[in-house]
């Protein structure tokens, strides 16, 4: 990520929007919490954000404040990673490792389970990390040839609400990295930002996202159905396997509740009219492109 180029592009976007009377000032705002920062503070206090997180194949595409970056990383992002890891652990992929517990008559022994390229299983036990008496008991009386032992994965922290917030955050920042503040500065999106920063309460209706084998390429798609006027953001999470995510972010003309109602009523073989957001439009530096996107977001005409 070219941080200086990114900052200059965002400043140009803010300058144009300020001249159009859309925003109150030209100060950079963290896209997640909308806190304002001076030019000096942007360089010092904003950090590069991987979208999706680096552990799931993401790249640095945005700048967020240290508070949002840290909070998201330690709360919602880890839940999304653990959800993917948990799915893949069930498949026992070759050349992978995981932490497990051995359980025998109420005694627990921690270990690392290694699955080699031929899918043979090997237990690696770190004696220093276990109770010495428990380890002695396992070594001398339990871990015998052909012994039956209950093997359990170490539980991973997973919360559906936090996973949902992480999926929304990724889509929101992908859209922001493409369009800047052009329309996302609207207070309409405060609820979306609040849902990301405070996942537990139901601020937005469920569900604006889906995890399916989507046939279209990653990208941002404009929906041509006015009932769902907004953006389908499609992206991929990568671990051992790849997982396609599609998130719908409505335009300010479409209430969130109405959007989820129409999304729920889409049948398996229904066709949704969409078009890829044209790559040749520069929503940071070209006033005409910014005006055109805003007209589409706040009106009902074609893009």
Language model region names:
Residues 5-19, 44-51:
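Short Cys/His-rich Zn2+-coordinating modules
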Residues 15-27, 53-59:
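Short, flexible, mixed-charge glycine/proline-rich loop motifs
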Residues 37-61:
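Histidine-centered nuclease catalytic patch
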Residues 72-115:
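Polybasic, low-complexity binding patches
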Residues 136-303:
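C-terminal, charged low-complexity interaction regions
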Residues 52-67, 86-99:
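Short microdomains enriched in Cys/His and/or Lys/Arg
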Residues 30-33, 65-68:
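Short cysteine-rich clusters marking metal-coordination/redox-active sites
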Residues 37-39, 69-72:
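Cys/His-rich microdomains that often coordinate metals
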